[in-house]
Amino acid sequence: MAKPLWLSLILFIIPVALAVGVDQSKNEVKAQNYFGSINISNANVKQCVWFAMKEYNKESEDKYVFLVDKILHAKLQITDRMEYQIDVQISRSNCKKPLNNTENCIPQKKPELEKKMSCSFLVGALPWNGEFNLLSKECKDV
């Protein structure tokens, strides 16, 4: 016999309610699960890196597209969404902007155009809805 729909909903909502709390006095969401390391090969991490780089390249004034060389570290925190803190190493590619497809791009080989950076991105995500927001980014030359 099938479970009633309401029972399934309750069983789904309880863990979510336990994971996130609201401070009524300040009317803001508090993290119940503080940043913890996660595997850099996690599918959601890869989606967030793709999104962060798309935003980075859109906002960058550089003439060339930057690509991820390596994902260095990833952390996850659960609030009213999933927040991913991701550290990456990126480099300038041989592809000029604007560009929608980076499949044929490779890191820049000309010494005068080579540039590597270390970046930390904070991405808010509801991956099951396809919703991503770049909450912060910090990059420095390597």
From Swiss-Prot:
Protein location: Secreted
InterPro entries given in the database record: Cystatin_dom (IPR000010), Cystatin_sf (IPR046350), Sperm_Mat_Cystatin (IPR052691)
SUPFAM superfamilies per UniProt: Cystatin/monellin (SSF54403)
Gene Ontology cellular component terms for the protein in this record: cell surface; cytoplasm; extracellular region
Tissue localization of expression: Proximal caput region of the epididymis. Lower expression in the testis. Within the testis it is localized to the elongating spermatids, whereas within the epididymis it is exclusively synthesized by the proximal caput epithelium.
Disulphide linkage map: C95-C105, C119-C139
Induction description: Testicular factors or hormones other than androgens present in the testicular fluid may be involved in the regulation of CRES gene expression.
GO molecular function, one term: cysteine-type endopeptidase inhibitor activity
Span of the annotated motif Secondary area of contact: 77-81
Keywords for the protein's UniProt record, in alphabetical order: Disulfide bond, Glycoprotein, Protease inhibitor, Secreted, Signal, Thiol protease inhibitor
Gene3D superfamilies registered for this protein in UniProt: 3.10.450.10
Signal sequence, start to end: 1-19
Glycosylated position list: N39, N100
Keyword Glycoprotein: yes
UniProt xrefs under Pfam families: Cystatin (PF00031)
Recorded family membership: Belongs to the cystatin family.
PANTHER family, per the entry: CYSTATIN-8, CYSTATIN-8-RELATED
Functional summary from the UniProt entry: Performs a specialized role during sperm development and maturation.
Name of this chain's protein: Cystatin-8
Organism the protein comes from: Mus musculus
